[in-house]
């Protein structure tokens, strides 16, 4: 458990996981799927949250269609721990609602925001890092982003440029944020890694009051609708614009710190993640499900129905689920969101 007994944990459990299409869909997004271990990602995340705070200080933010799958897999989790989003409006309105909700109870309470679809190991290092992040929040009244040291060049992640060193507990390294850099090109990402920038994990800690203040300053188009929450969540979500917290607040705020994590982290962001999270064969093929390769190398295969056989194939992602089969080059795995937008426009 965390040292501070006023901290809350918010689990962001919405999102479609479009880069895991066709397995991940609106009705069955990736956080409900056993993509890495035998159990779904959501179960691991709730266990992680429970290692920090008691159940009564955990809130799960999810669309109404996802609450029942959570409840069925977590029968002992309190029913009032779910904040059901009436409409999908992105992480900024969702976290504004969560901050308002917690501020009604304790305005100076610290919120730790987690995603339901990340892989984090080991648990002890995660607890140590979050405890230090909460300590930075309480010492400096800053908003804290948890960052990790890059182990490769990655254009799909936000990068954090550290500045002035700050005190942090447990010997961890914390810094004022000099700048956030969103999803650079490959050459720029390489420069960031060489310069000691960190990846933005999307795990944040901040006081409920402080987040609401920053939303008021940097996202007034969201803040002006917060009084509607006195009525109900539906009134708020009907009128609030869609926005993500990174663009609405994180990249604009001058009150951010970054804390270097001691855990390993993966956002399981695309099919390419399976190559990092599963063992490959001698030819570099990663196979999840029933698959076989002959004279093939460096492929990623996932099937939850039937089997897949590859012959003389290299560097492909091959996905089979239900009545759909997807085949694409591995280097295009991160582009699936754009493919879905094109398919939707042509439908």
Language-model region placement:
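Solvent-exposed alpha-helices and their adjacent loops that cap or buttress functional pockets
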Residues: 1-5, 12, 51-53, 104-106, ...
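Conserved N-terminal catalytic core of the sugar/cofactor nucleotidyltransferase
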Residues: 1-11, 19-29, 34-131, 148, ...
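A short acidic, often aromatic-flanked loop/helix-cap motif at beta-alpha or helix-coil junctions
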Residues: 88-93, 152-154, 186-187, 265-267
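Left-handed beta-helix
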Residues: 1-6, 206-347
């Amino acid at each position: 458990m965390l040292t501070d007994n006023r901290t809350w944990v918010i689990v962001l459990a919405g999102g479609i996981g479009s880069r895991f299409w066709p397995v991940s869909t609106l009705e069955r997004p990736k956080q409900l799927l056993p993509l890495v271990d035998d159990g779904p990602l959501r179960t691991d995340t709730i266990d992680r949250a429970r290692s920090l705070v008691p159940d009564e200080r955990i809130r799960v933010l999810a669309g109404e269609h996802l609450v029942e799958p959570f409840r069925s897999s977590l029968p002992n989790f309190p029913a009032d721990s779910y904040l059901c989003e009436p409409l999908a409006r992105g992480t900024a309105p969702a976290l504004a609602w969560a901050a308002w909700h917690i501020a009604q109870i304790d305005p100076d309470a610290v919120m730790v925001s987690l995603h339901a679809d990340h892989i984090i190991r080991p648990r002890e290092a995660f607890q140590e890092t979050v405890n230090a992040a909460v300590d930075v929040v309480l010492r400096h009244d800053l908003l804290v982003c948890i960052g990790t040291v890059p182990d490769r060049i990655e254009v799909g992640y936000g990068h954090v440029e550290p500045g002035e060193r700050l005190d942090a507990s447990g010997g961890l390294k914390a810094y004022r944020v000099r700048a956030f850099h969103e999803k650079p090109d490959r050459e720029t990402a390489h420069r960031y890694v060489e310069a000691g920038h960190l990846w933005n994990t999307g795990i944040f800690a901040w006081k409920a009051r402080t987040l609401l203040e920053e939303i008021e300053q940097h996202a007034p188009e969201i803040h002006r609708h917060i009084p509607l929450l006195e009525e109900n969540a539906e009134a708020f979500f009907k009128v609030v614009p869609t926005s993500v917290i990174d663009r609405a607040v994180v990249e604009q705020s001058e009150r951010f710190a970054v804390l270097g994590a001691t855990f390993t982290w993966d956002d399981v962001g695309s099919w390419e993640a399976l190559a990092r999270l599963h063992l490959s064969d001698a030819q570099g093929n990663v196979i999840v499900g029933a698959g076989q390769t002959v004279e093939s190398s460096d492929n990623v295969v996932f099937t939850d129905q039937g089997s897949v056989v590859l012959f003389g194939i290299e560097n492909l992602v091959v996905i089979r689920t239900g009545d759909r089969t997807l085949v694409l080059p591995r280097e295009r795995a991160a582009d699936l969101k754009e493919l879905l937008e094109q398919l939707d426009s042509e439908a």
